[in-house]
């Protein structure tokens, strides 16, 4: 069994980096940064907790890649409604290059309502969110694997799109899908993912 480090992005950068160095020094397997923009809070009137500093995940991962030289790194997981899949693929390829081939792309349907509302992203219905996840996974996988990608989907459209760098020294960047919904998520995992993240308990 491998052990990884999943820090909160609501802590100061110096503390997060110290935790990453400690994880690497102990031989841990990976560092996973949560992909959120603010503290989770009830939707409605603005909550004071939303003003607490929260580090953006991909910027944080790039810094970790440069300063922590061995462990795997990735977002756990990147909500597909936050960024266009082509942007995610481009960031993943760049992160893999910076890190010398240690990046993992984590994707999920997205769930935190307050950040979607505050930034005007729109969560959509349950089926829409999982349709978007399915299209995003297929698009990111193709962008990282193929020379050019064309997609005419309901949520993703690409026209002969390239994505370079797409993996350090020809590496195939692993795609991780987060979630445990039996009707949609598991099918998406089976079709597209190299790895699967879920919440689970021994019992």
Label each residue range with its predicted role.
Residues 1-203:
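Active-site-adjacent structural elements that line small-molecule/cofactor binding pockets in enzymes
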